[in-house]
């Protein structure tokens, strides 16, 4: 799978996992992250700016951690561990390593 598609999948998985914990507020917080555009919340469709997509995911993780603490960061990492296991180390956003 192409890196841009993988990173988008990671972002959606993080948002949906946070939504399972905190409800629709997860989408509201994701909207505040620069470089991430919510296309269709119900379908789970987003768009990441291709340049800096890894950094956008780092900002998304930081947004949740800032509000909900370290446990929120771990929820993000756990949500995508199967995806990042298949990626090259230099492709993985630093917040998920």
Region annotations inferred by a language model:
Residues 1-97:
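Long, compositionally biased intrinsically disordered regulatory segments in eukaryotic proteins
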């Amino acid at each position: 799978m192409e890196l841009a598609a993988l990173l988008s999948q990671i972002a959606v998985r993080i948002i949906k996992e946070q939504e399972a914990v905190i409800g629709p507020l997860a989408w509201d917080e994701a909207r505040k992250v620069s470089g991430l555009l919510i296309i269709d919340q119900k379908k789970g469709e987003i768009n990441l700016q291709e340049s800096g997509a890894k950094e956008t995911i780092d900002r998304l993780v930081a947004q949740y951690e800032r509000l909900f603490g370290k446990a929120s960061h771990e929820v993000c990492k756990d949500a995508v561990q199967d995806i990042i296991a298949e990626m090259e180390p230099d492709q993985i956003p630093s917040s998920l390593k």
